[in-house]
Amino acid sequence: MTMKQFEIAAIPGDGVGKEVVAAAEKVLHTAAEVHGGLSFSFTAFPWSCDYYLEHGKMMPEDGIHTLTQFEAVFLGAVGNPKLVPDHISLWGLLLKIRRELELSINMRPAKQMAGITSPLLHPNDFDFVVIRENSEGEYSEVGGRIHRGDDEIAIQNAVFTRKATERVMRFAFELAKKRRSHVTSATKSNGIYHAMPFWDEVFQQTAADYSGIETSSQHIDALAAFFVTRPETFDVIVASNLFGDILTDISSSLMGSIGIAPSANINPSGKYPSMFEPVHGSAPDIAGQGLANPIGQIWTAKLMLDHFGEEELGAKILDVMEQVTADGIKTRDIGGQSTTAEVTDEICSRLRKL
């Protein structure tokens, strides 16, 4: 068997990012041992708020070029407002990477994890993925402000291109082929006059190329409500930048803790490496205490394996994670008493027994 080695740029970042990235790397190395035919090489970069205080920037001038030499970027968490204002840390590192590596698609799975209590009374074993357009839409910089006082006006333009809209929809349909063959479109064409009817048209045209996939369209207000009342009915949801942002925050909450929510930022062309990061922040208040939940970062590592074409190995990691949480080996944020290291070590131990 030819040994495959994946070269990964690791950016632990701030706060608990350092702890959870180390935990996920340990799980990946263990998974590689179990697999026997692949390995992971991590190159760590110290880009963080501490780096900013020393160098006056969140990353060096050639930082993006450096990242292009790797097959993926594995990021922990960014931000510490006591050291650096959030807008500087966010735009100087995380958003800079997303934009310059053309990470136009954001993917966030959500499922009812065994042993973790959802805030829903009857969660009914939901398992879905939100695919969010990550490069344009409502979060454009087109617009402006004029006048002051009673005549003051702020104009914010949303930008929807056919290229980006069709790209995110095709990604969603291709993913649905590997899952339960259903795609839901998040729209608001009954209230947004131009952009959402365009979105609906592109969705219908794209769906015509995927005869085996069932489709539905839901207005964002109703869809947000359905996430709460019947999340088990969804498979793949495709959404614009703003709508996807809203839906993914709801989906993280449904799982019981933002600490277990994973995320992937994908360059669908493969021109540049994709970036994988958990949804949670840097949580500086608990950093260094062994309280951080490693599940979000480890699940994010599973998404990276899927991206590398190692879906079977990724599925094993997810299965073992659920076995561990089902047996009550959990951090405090999800009702347990275990430390970061104890959860990580238990996952590794069970992987070795496969």
Swiss-Prot record:
Enzyme nomenclature, EC number: 1.1.1.93, 4.1.1.73, 1.1.1.83
Positions annotated to bind Mn(2+): 221, 245, 249
Lyase keyword on record: yes
Keywords from the named record: Lyase, Manganese, Metal-binding, NAD, Oxidoreductase
InterPro entries: ICDH/IPMDH (IPR050501), IsoCit/isopropylmalate_DH_CS (IPR019818), IsoPropMal-DH-like_dom (IPR024084), TTC_DH (IPR011829)
Protein name: Probable tartrate dehydrogenase/decarboxylase
Reactions catalysed according to its record: tartrate + NAD(+) = 2-hydroxy-3-oxosuccinate + NADH + H(+); (2R,3S)-tartrate + NAD(+) = 2-hydroxy-3-oxosuccinate + NADH + H(+); (2R,3R)-tartrate + NAD(+) = 2-hydroxy-3-oxosuccinate + NADH + H(+); (2R,3R)-tartrate + H(+) = (R)-glycerate + CO2
Signal peptide: none
Annotated GO MF terms: D-malate dehydrogenase (decarboxylating) (NAD+) activity; magnesium ion binding; NAD binding; tartrate decarboxylase activity; tartrate dehydrogenase activity
Source organism: Bacillus subtilis (strain 168)
Role this protein plays: Has multiple catalytic activities. Apart from catalyzing the oxidation of (+)-tartrate to oxaloglycolate, also converts meso-tartrate to D-glycerate and catalyzes the oxidative decarboxylation of D-malate to pyruvate.
The keyword Metal-binding is assigned to this record: yes
NCBIfam families, A to Z: PRK08194.1, TTC
Free-text cofactor note: Binds 1 Mg(2+) or Mn(2+) ion per subunit.
The protein's required cofactors: Mg(2+); Mn(2+); K(+)
Recorded name of the encoding gene: ycsA
Homology family: Belongs to the isocitrate and isopropylmalate dehydrogenases family.
